């Protein structure tokens, strides 16, 4: 498709404020030029963003070039400084891309539309990369045209146009751009596909980029259907009295492929990346399908799936905390529990700690110790905390994290105000001190 102002505007996501990701290269130079033309004829707001990765020695010169171009267009330019260096185990490409997108996402205001310059050939490269990595449908869907992004929307208005169309437009308009030497480095997978593989495929099948992009669209449609099916399965399996957990019996009645679909969606909905396929299958077999009352668990870098009392629990990585920690607390300001949330106290009607005993005693906060006992308000006799936790069905991995509030060294409440000691409990018809724990 020939790239022109009219053909570009026809596919532009409607909006009033656009942020143009501007690297200074060919593709983003064309994108900025087009957006400025749209601004001239329709009055939209346009602002450019340049990400300074600090990797290439030419990075400072590129920033100056982008500033000069933006100035000629009369467009404000924001330069975001990031550390794009890779960490152990990450590819340089992935590290730079992740850092770039995080910075762009954080820069958006509500209602902003971030436009980036990926095009038809980029889409074909992405699909080939995902195929070679053994990706599933979501990965093979490649790059969407528009997607929620931070406070705004990420939009790729050039996906319908090929690299040749973009180059022809730039030459017609007399645009200038910078060349990133790393784009010629075939040690990077994407460059190898771009420079070696796609040209050979195009020599045999000239429409290869368009055809691969069409296949990516089919995969995106199928992935959307599966997501909706997974949401239906998850709604049926989610415990009504414990949102976020799945009822084991319901999950066990599903077919293996439905179980895998559900597990992936469940993990994704919690904001975590699903484990590799082999590990997901281990979770299905060893945690879901294992018979009896066992409490198996499987962890990976992103989280842990555990089974307890006929429920499946998904836990994000927990911050380390010191079980021997103790601290004095006035109760007048919130108390931060390192790696375990915070406590705050408030006067509220209903069950709580007697305000007079609260004010007259020395308040400390700690965690469970061997032999800790409590006489719960409204019950006779002292009980080990371990037994109280078991009665309440508190999962084992949460028991040692329950903050314990003591007055003059004696337990007054546990887990915020979930368990109150009878000797410190106020009359329930009065206004009392209620301790709230936010994990």
Swiss-Prot record:
The organism's place on the tree of life at top rank: Bacteria
Reactions mediated catalytically: cytidine(34) in tRNA(Ile2) + L-lysine + ATP = lysidine(34) in tRNA(Ile2) + AMP + diphosphate + H(+)
Q: Quote the Gene3D superfamilies the UniProt record gives.
A: 1.20.59.20, HUPs (3.40.50.620)
The entry lists its GO molecular-function terms as: ATP binding; tRNA(Ile)-lysidine synthase activity
User: Where does this protein hold ATP?
Assistant: 23-28
Q: Which InterPro entries match?
A: Lysidine-tRNA-synth_C, Rossmann-like_a/b/a_fold, TilS/TtcA_N, tRNA_Ile_lys_synt, tRNA_Ile_lys_synt_N, tRNA_Ile_lys_synt_subst-bd
Q: Which CDD domains match?
A: TilS_N
Q: Which SMART domains match?
A: TilS_C
Which compartments does it reside in?
Cytoplasm
Name the EC number(s).
6.3.4.19
Gene Ontology biological process terms, A to Z:
tRNA modification
Q: Which NCBIfam families match?
A: lysidine_TilS_C, lysidine_TilS_N
Q: What is known of its domains?
A: The N-terminal region contains the highly conserved SGGXDS motif, predicted to be a P-loop motif involved in ATP binding.
Function per UniProt: Ligates lysine onto the cytidine present at position 34 of the AUA codon-specific tRNA(Ile) that contains the anticodon CAU, in an ATP-dependent manner. Cytidine is converted to lysidine, thus changing the amino acid specificity of the tRNA from methionine to isoleucine.
Query: Its family?
Result: Belongs to the tRNA(Ile)-lysidine synthase family.
Q: Can you name this protein? A: tRNA(Ile)-lysidine synthase
């Amino acid at each position: 498709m020939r790239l022109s102002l009219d053909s570009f505007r026809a596919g532009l996501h409607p909006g009033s404020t656009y942020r143009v990701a501007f690297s200074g290269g060919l593709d983003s130079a064309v994108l900025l030029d087009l957006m400025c033309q749209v601004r001239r004829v329709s009055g939209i707001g346009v602002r450019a963003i340049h990400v300074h990765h600090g990797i290439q020695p030419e990075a400072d010169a590129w920033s100056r070039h982008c500033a000069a171009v933006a100035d000629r267009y009369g467009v404000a330019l924001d330069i975001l400084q990031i550390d794009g260096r890779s960490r152990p185990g990450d590819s340089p490409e992935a590290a730079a891309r992740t850092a770039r997108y995080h910075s762009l996402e954080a820069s958006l205001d509500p209602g902003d539309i971030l436009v980036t310059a990926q095009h038809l050939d980029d889409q074909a490269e992405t699909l080939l990369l995902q195929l070679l990595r053994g990706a599933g449908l979501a990965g093979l869907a490649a790059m969407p045209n528009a997607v929620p992004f931070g406070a705004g929307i990420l939009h790729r208005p050039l996906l319908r146009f090929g690299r040749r169309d973009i180059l022809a437009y730039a030459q017609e308009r007399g645009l200038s751009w910078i060349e990133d030497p790393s784009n010629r480095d075939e040690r990077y997978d994407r460059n190898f596909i771009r420079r070696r593989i796609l040209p050979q495929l195009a020599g045999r099948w000239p429409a290869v980029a368009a055809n691969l992009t069409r296949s990516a669209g089919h995969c995106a449609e199928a992935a959307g259907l599966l997501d909706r099916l997974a949401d239906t399965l998850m709604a049926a399996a989610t415990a009504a009295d414990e949102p976020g957990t799945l009822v084991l019996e319901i999950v066990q009645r599903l077919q293996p492929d439905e179980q895998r679909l559900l597990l992936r969606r469940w993990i994704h909905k919690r904001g975590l990346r699903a484990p590799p396929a082999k590990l997901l299958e281990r979770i299905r077999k060893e945690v879901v399908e294992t018979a009896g009352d066992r409490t198996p668990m499987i962890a990976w870098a992103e989280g842990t799936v555990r089974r307890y009392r006929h429920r499946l629990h998904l836990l994000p990585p927990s911050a380390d905390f010191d079980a021997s920690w103790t601290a004095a607390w006035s109760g007048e300001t919130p108390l931060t529990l390192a790696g375990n949330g915070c406590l705050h106290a408030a006067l509220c009607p209903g069950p709580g700690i007697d305000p007079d005993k609260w004010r007259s005693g020395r308040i400390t906060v700690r965690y469970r110790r061997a032999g800790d006992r409590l006489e719960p308000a409204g019950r006779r006799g002292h009980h080990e905390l371990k037994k109280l936790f078991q009665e309440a069905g508190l999962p084992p991995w949460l028991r040692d994290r329950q903050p314990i509030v003591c007055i003059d060294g004696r337990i007054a409440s546990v887990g915020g105000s979930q368990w109150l000691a009878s000797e410190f409990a106020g009359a329930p018809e009065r206004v009392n001190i209620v301790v709230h724990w936010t994990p």
